[in-house]
Amino acid sequence: MKFTKPLLLLIVAIIASSNAAETFSNFQVTNSDASSPCVTTPVELKVNTCQSACGSILNVLPVTGSTSKFTFNQFGAQDTKCAATPTSSNEFTCVDGKSKVAIGTTTYSVVCVPDKTNSSESDSSDSTRIGASFALFALALLSMLAL
């Protein structure tokens, strides 16, 4: 029974680190409309921000209770504050990092850009998390051996 407390700590730490949900607040958007200014060059959209992009007024809003579902809204050309009811809207989910979203007659390609958990985190964050998990496991193992 010496191992009970360290083993429970290890299990809780593993569950906590594996349940960390990926969050998104930036999206790179292109569309297939030949007259659009963002056919080849992606435009960056931010969550909860009314922006002029791809020849339209757009905003992306998070769906309550989800870290990966969003509502993509298109507004009339004069509604630069996104104050009126959207002219078109559709919900999308960031699953594989890339989604196709049809809004009105336009289909947008949306690349979901994962948030960084801190400013020093780089694109190699997966290997950093693996290293941290290994260190946590080693610490728990050492504490079990010390008992």
Swiss-Prot record:
Organism placement in taxonomy: Eukaryota, Amoebozoa, Evosea, Eumycetozoa, Dictyostelia
Top-level taxonomic group: Eukaryota
Record carries keyword Membrane: yes
Signal peptide: 1-20
UniProt keyword annotations, A-Z: Cell membrane, Glycoprotein, GPI-anchor, Lipoprotein, Membrane, Signal
Name by which UniProt lists this protein: Ponticulin-like protein C2
Gene designation: ponC2
Organism: Dictyostelium discoideum (Social amoeba)
Compartment(s) of residence: Cell membrane
Post-translational modifications reported in the UniProt record: The GPI-like-anchor contains a phosphoceramide group, rather than a phosphatidyl group.
